[in-house]
Amino acid sequence: MKKIDRETFPFYRFDRLAACREINHFVSSGVKDISFLGNEEPVRVVANRRELGENAGFELDRLVVGNQVHGADITVVTAEDAGRGAYDNESRLPDTDALVTDEAGICLMVLTADCVPVLLYDRKCGAIAAIHAGWKGTAADIVGKTVNLLR
């Protein structure tokens, strides 16, 4: 993983995914809160997400976030879902721990603390996935199920 030093909001990229120029990805440095579930004011979280987008190269209006429930449900994200969960928790996609899309310009985001974030890319079909893999989801094979969905 390589740190991308941006003055206002550093982030990380995985070397292997960074070699795939047709997609964009990031891992937040945690310098600023991008979760509505913490103690940060919602207006500040939105500003932090917008700033991260400016630094990492995604549009906040195209960000999609799900309501993570530590399960194994997978949601296929469409263009109509763009912006769900970007500006508030109420608009998140319901009860899902993996997001998959082949829509260009959509940014999928999962939030983790002690769970594992998994990012996948299938060059053949042009699909990406972002997975929140907690112990229950891992035991229920959320990663394997997501890989199978990408095929």
Stretch-by-stretch model annotation:
Residues 1-13:
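Short, Gly/Pro- and small/polar-rich lid/capping loops
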Residues 13-16, 20:
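RNA-interacting cores
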Residues 16, 30, 68-71:
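Residues that form or immediately flank small-molecule/cofactor binding pockets and catalytic motifs
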Residues 20-56:
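Intrinsically disordered, low-complexity, positively charged segments
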Residues 46-49, 53-131:
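Phosphate-centric recognition/catalysis
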Residues 118-151:
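Glycine- and Gly-Pro-enriched alpha-helical subdomains that act as flexible
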